[in-house]
Amino acid sequence: MANQVIRCKAAVAWEAGKPLSIEEIEVAPPQAHEVRIKIIATAVCHTDAYTLSGADPEGCFPVILGHEGAGIVESVGEGVTKLKAGDTVIPLYIPQCGECKFCLNPKTNLCQKIRVTQGKGLMPDGTSRFTCKGKPILHFMGTSTFSEYTVVADISVAKIDPSAPLDKVCLLGCGISTGYGAAVNTAKVEPGSTCAVFGLGGVGLAVIMGCKVAGASRIIGIDINKDKFAKAKEFGATECINPQDFSKSIQEVLIEMTDGGVDFSFECIGNVKVMRSALEAAHKGWGVSVVVGVAASGEEISTRPFQLVTGRTWKGTAFGGWKSVESVPKLVSEYMSKKIKVDEFVTGNLSFDQINKAFDLMHSGNSIRTVLKM
């Protein structure tokens, strides 16, 4: 099949705001420096829903969404040297070419090699590998895991331990890695520190896990849904609070609880007002606040400059700061050695045909991650 078109099932988003449609598509062979992957498992993330909603300024249709997946290499294009058919892999929405100035700088993981074409929903040569009903279908985040087969750039693939369970480690393609890395890489949480995590979805839970691994002594979870508190405590939160239970602002509450503010705070929602609260809950002189959540297009953050003049630091993170190709295999190893949790993020499994139900579960607030088995 290596040089042939593959016919398979995919969940196509024909237009914004409509449910995904399971269709038969054609997947073209990989071109030079591309890899065709048989997806074994994929999860549904809020980023997929954000683009499907039509709110994403980079969102283009028709498209095959999905960016938390894992699978097996089916074939490779010309010039691919580090991967071969049969390799177990996780596709990556932030690549690592190893050559651009971003890859060569230890301070960032934001490889720019294929950014322009990826943002347009195309492969690096400016075309698509997907066709449905005679029409080209766009790629998404360079991964498009909502398909039985996908084609990705060879710099957007992490080769992992073949014994890893793909219906679990697919989650390391986005949410868990993002939250965990926000704590250990971006914030660099210190032993004995006090942390506050705003938003207790999958990413927030991963931040809590990272804070615990880093040795934080106090981890305060914050959410308006108290049903999420028990799970947060399982992941390492020492206490949880609901902002709606207080008459004063949440930053005032946290400052009182912590004798002046927290050492590290994390916004895992994508709400610019909460981003301000998280910054202002950080301790004067040394507090660090990390923006993890992705705000809607056009939103702006604000605070009084005095908050920064008096020693607080405001930072952002993408994919937890991990240089992807080299780091994801290590994260899989950490999971296999039980240093980090992954299984506990999976709240359900569904067949691929039930993908729209997985979106409904996510919107209900009762699920962390639903994994689809292809």
From Swiss-Prot:
Enzyme Commission number, as recorded: 1.1.1.1, 1.1.1.-, 1.1.1.284
Modified residues (N6-succinyllysine): 233, 315
Keywords: Acetylation, Cytoplasm, Lipid metabolism, Metal-binding, NAD, Oxidoreductase, Phosphoprotein, Zinc
Marked site: Important for FDH activity and activation by fatty acids: 115
PROSITE patterns: ADH_ZINC (PS00059)
Residues found modified as N-acetylalanine: 2
GO cellular component: cytosol; mitochondrion
CDD domains in alphabetical order: alcohol_DH_class_III
Residues that bind Zn(2+) 2: 97, 100, 103, 111
Record's keyword annotation contains Oxidoreductase: yes
Any one GO biological process: positive regulation of blood pressure
Domain of life assignment: Eukaryota
Key word ATP-binding present: no
GO molecular function: alcohol dehydrogenase (NAD+) activity; fatty acid binding; formaldehyde dehydrogenase (NAD+) activity; identical protein binding; S-(hydroxymethyl)glutathione dehydrogenase (NAD+) activity; S-(hydroxymethyl)glutathione dehydrogenase (NADP+) activity; S-(hydroxymethyl)glutathione dehydrogenase [NAD(P)+] activity; S-nitrosoglutathione reductase (NADH) activity
Cofactor requirement: Zn(2+)
Catalysed transformations (reactions): a primary alcohol + NAD(+) = an aldehyde + NADH + H(+); a secondary alcohol + NAD(+) = a ketone + NADH + H(+); S-(hydroxymethyl)glutathione + NADP(+) = S-formylglutathione + NADPH + H(+); S-(hydroxymethyl)glutathione + NAD(+) = S-formylglutathione + NADH + H(+)
Binding site for Zn(2+) 1: 45, 67, 174
Principal place of residence: cytoplasm
Free-text remark on how the cofactor is bound: Binds 2 Zn(2+) ions per subunit.
Protein location: Cytoplasm
Residues recorded with modification Phosphoserine: 247, 324, 351
Subunit structure: Homodimer.
Family: Belongs to the zinc-containing alcohol dehydrogenase family. Class-III subfamily.
The protein's name: Alcohol dehydrogenase class-3
Species per Swiss-Prot/TrEMBL record: Rattus norvegicus (Rat)
